[in-house]
Amino acid sequence: MDGNMKRVLVIGGGGYCGSLLVPQLLDEGWDVTVYDILVWYGSAHLPTGNPKLRIIQGDVRDAAQIALACVGQDSVLHLACISNDASFELDERLSTSVNLESFEPVVIAAKKAGVKRFIFASSSSVYGVSDSPDVTEDHPLMPLTLYNKYKGMCEPLLSKHTDENFVGVIFRPATVCGYAPRQRLDLSVNILTNHAVNKRKITVFGGSQLRPNLHVQDYADLCKLLLAAPDEKIANQIFNCGFQNLSIMDIAKVVKKVVEEEFPENGSIPIEITSSDDLRSYHINSSKIKRALGFEPKHSVEDAVRGLCEAFRQGKLPDSFDDDRYYNVRTMKAVGAE
């Protein structure tokens, strides 16, 4: 991308990943507009005093407001959705309108406004269940839930509008983990770490399911790379982005090891196993993004657990079981999904 093109609209920029990414974009000289409904923390976790940051509180389904937000932007980074199956299933009509029906109008608005690049955060969960040893981007999509299905359905809705003046790129991130200012504690690594630190035990649901993982800082680094990469390297491309394909039980063992090292005064952390109806299991291959863009993760699941331990130690995550803001489904219930 032209080095002079440094204006980006981050839709969903107030969320878990956006809260870490946005300050870094500002530090790197971007003019950033965050468009977000801001029902979790408001804008308190964003650097509101930075003159290069503009925050628009809005609904992604509001086509007119989205169109105005796109004016003057060089790039759009679309991170917004009702995230995870439990939140989605609270109100399928609402979730369908947000996660699927609003998507193409946003793409059309961006193109009409003269945006040059559109980056969409899909999900590696579009693969559902696969016994393939390496799931590449060409693997058939076999989503198990509507949340995952709609992520996959949005991808061609972007691709059909791209051309030489409107570059589209899609990435399929793995389950994200680690500390960010707008913290989530309803994701696998983060859940297990919270329980290990604060309940001094780990409960594993199932255990054999394979899951790829992605540190939230690597997620942010990937977004920055996709914003800066030359058009010819990313145009109409889909990239897996998930590393450390671990079973849920192996994740639990990593969490146990790290938490016992970080909090030796708490003694041994037991692992308890219970049944699960979450059948998602897949081992993704992310070599394409390494070949095309040289992207490799710099952070591990162990790093994510250590970062969370430090956040707990510093009191950055108070009331980690009772504060609804850490849990998407509970926040949606609290504000009244409609």
Name these PLM-found stretches.
Residues 200, 205-338:
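C-terminal substrate-binding subdomain of Rossmann-fold SDR/epimerase-dehydratase oxidoreductases
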Residues 150:
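Active-site helix of classical SDR
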Residues 60-98:
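NAD(P)H-binding glycine-rich loop region in Rossmannoid oxidoreductase-like domains
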Residues 2-75:
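N-terminal Rossmann/SDR dinucleotide-binding element
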